[in-house]
Amino acid sequence: MSRMRLIVAGAGGRMGRALVRAIADSDGAELAGALEAPGSELIGKDSGLLAGLPANNIKLSADLWAMSAEADGILDFTVPAATIANVAIAAERGIVHVVGTTGLSASDDAVIKSVTKRAIVVQSGNMSLGVNLLSALVKQVAKSLDANFDIEILEMHHKHKVDAPSGTALMLGRAAAEGRGITLDGHSARGRDGITGARRSGDIGFASLRGGTAAGDHSVIFAGPSERLVLSHQAEDRMIFAHGALKAALWAHGKPPGYYTMDDVLGLKDLF
């Protein structure tokens, strides 16, 4: 069976370079293109060399339409505006679109889902096995514990991360809300400062820390009367996200059009 030909969006960034390395290590995929933002000083650079690998003669380019002509999929960990632009082209080309971009708005998510009647999209706030297992556990614990247990989510990332709370924190918050039978939008508490008053019952709180080179630490705290339960995950290397994204692309190749998540890829929907 031929290898899946994949484009890496944002190939010059930290995550993009990790994706290039993951593809180079894979027996089931090969790099078909390296996408970078128009005007970037990295346009024309060799994607292999940028990723710390031998030269692969695949240069960074801003022309997704051209590079997608012979591709089977795109791995997209960029910024919301770029992802939304990529969605239309990926759908038109009929290639798998793996979306790991965070900071997307509700309207952005609606645009992504709007193409899935004719396109294959796999989207997740986090592509690692551990975090997706954590999400399933959070949902089950939130369902099992009563409202006397307050839910707080703490996350830490490197100092260069531009959005907060992280996409993973929001993913865990949605899992907790689903377990409680509520919506996160109506029960989210963020950025507490000053005289805030007592904690509102039923809220799911978020706190974000930024510093150093942390790849991603997440803890979900269930704080009850006289006891606390803490479920945590620490990412030690962003390669776990790259390998997860690659797994998602290979899983989705040949699937019917639709909207999929890592729960589908990892078979977690029927875990509990």
Curated annotation (Swiss-Prot):
UniProt keywords, alphabetically: Amino-acid biosynthesis, Cytoplasm, Diaminopimelate biosynthesis, Lysine biosynthesis, NAD, NADP, Oxidoreductase
Subcellular location: Cytoplasm
Positions that bind NAD(+): G10, A11, G12, G13, R14, M15, E36, G100, T101, T102, S124, G125, N126, M127
Catalytic EC class: oxidoreductase
Annotated residues for binding of (S)-2,3,4,5-tetrahydrodipicolinate: H158, G167, T168
CDD domains xref list: DHDPR_N
Alphabetical list of PROSITE patterns matching this protein: DAPB (PS01298)
UniProt-listed Pfam families: DapB_C, DapB_N
Entry-linked SUPFAM superfamilies: Glyceraldehyde-3-phosphate dehydrogenase-like, C-terminal domain, NAD(P)-binding Rossmann-fold domains
Pathway(s) this gene product operates in, as recorded in its UniProt entry: Amino-acid biosynthesis; L-lysine biosynthesis via DAP pathway; (S)-tetrahydrodipicolinate from L-aspartate: step 4/4
Record field: catalytic activity: (S)-2,3,4,5-tetrahydrodipicolinate + NAD(+) + H2O = (2S,4S)-4-hydroxy-2,3,4,5-tetrahydrodipicolinate + NADH + H(+); (S)-2,3,4,5-tetrahydrodipicolinate + NADP(+) + H2O = (2S,4S)-4-hydroxy-2,3,4,5-tetrahydrodipicolinate + NADPH + H(+)
Domain of life: Bacteria
Gene Ontology terms for molecular function: 4-hydroxy-tetrahydrodipicolinate reductase; NAD binding; NADP binding; oxidoreductase activity, acting on CH or CH2 groups, NAD or NADP as acceptor
GO CC annotation terms, alphabetical: cytosol
Biological process (GO), any one: diaminopimelate biosynthetic process
Family named by the database record: Belongs to the DapB family.
Name this protein carries in UniProt: 4-hydroxy-tetrahydrodipicolinate reductase
Gene giving rise to this polypeptide: dapB
